[in-house]
Curated annotation (Swiss-Prot):
GO cellular component: a single term: extracellular region
Residue ranges of domain EGF-like in the record: 111-142, 144-184
Gene: Egfl8
Keywords, alphabetical: Calcium, Coiled coil, Disulfide bond, EGF-like domain, Glycoprotein, Repeat, Secreted, Signal
Record-linked PROSITE patterns: ASX_HYDROXYL (PS00010), EGF_1 (PS00022), EGF_2 (PS01186), EGF_3 (PS50026), EGF_CA (PS01187), EMI (PS51041)
Protein name: Epidermal growth factor-like protein 8
Range of residues in the leader sequence: 1-28
Cross-referenced InterPro entries: Dev_Signal_Modulators, EGF-like_Ca-bd_dom, EGF-like_dom, EGF-type_Asp/Asn_hydroxyl_site, EGF_Ca-bd_CS, EMI_domain, Growth_fac_rcpt_cys_sf, NOTCH1_EGF-like
Amino acid sequence: MGLWAELCISLRGLSFFLVLMTGEGTRGGSFKESLGVCSKQTLLVPLRYNESYSQPVYKPYLTLCAGRRICSTYRTTYRVAWREVRREVPQTHVVCCQGWKKPHPGALTCDAICSKPCLNGGVCTGPDRCECAPGWGGKHCHVDVDECRASLTLCSHGCLNTLGSFLCSCPHPLVLGLDGRTCAGGPPESPTSASILSVAVREADSEEERALRWEVAELRGRLEKLEQWATQAGAWVRAVLPMPPEELRPEQVAELWGRGDRIESLSDQVLLLEERLGACACEDNSLGPSLRG
């Protein structure tokens, strides 16, 4: 076997020896317990490898000594030689608990197994257990947490929930502070701009109120017609019910239920619009034109 082949074999054996001595996944050869490790075994593994060393070589030669005599002596030189080394080295082997696995076969740690991945930055910290990032919840970190409904007040005024977070808002003329949560006074406005804004707001409120009143009136008219029909239908039902139920035609039953659903829906719409109208207030706390007198 040539010198180059012996060198390759020795380097492979030495690298394997160093891996076993340092320990896979550890530093300084020390083993650190981790979560999910059920058992640990340290075995002595026989290892055979080649190592290099300096071999002395003695070369004799003749020289001239004192008295003109010829003397025999030698000089020492060194060359790189190889020798086979056998020794037993400790090797640690771990067994993972149920619900845990090794990241690779030679690892000394175990990672948790989650049947479904942890979403939105979540981390699998135990068997089918996710540790979610702030703003997310649920078993797999797939549910957005509504911070605005939390018991802890996050915003001094308005709060808008977003995916994984929230935003704070401020009413006019306040502005959001540097902390992004509290409101502070904004820059002073000129009287002209303030008066223009006030007029625009009053005009917008007036137009919205007229539109709401027209919509309420229209819905009330439709509701009155349906109530009249319901009265007539009630009399028809009372006249029909004494007959056996199997004699009722399916289209009559379907029409009766459909009209009833429309009446209920219109009643809800009218109630909602009346509540919105009741929330309107004049600037000087006076009654509107329709409520005076």
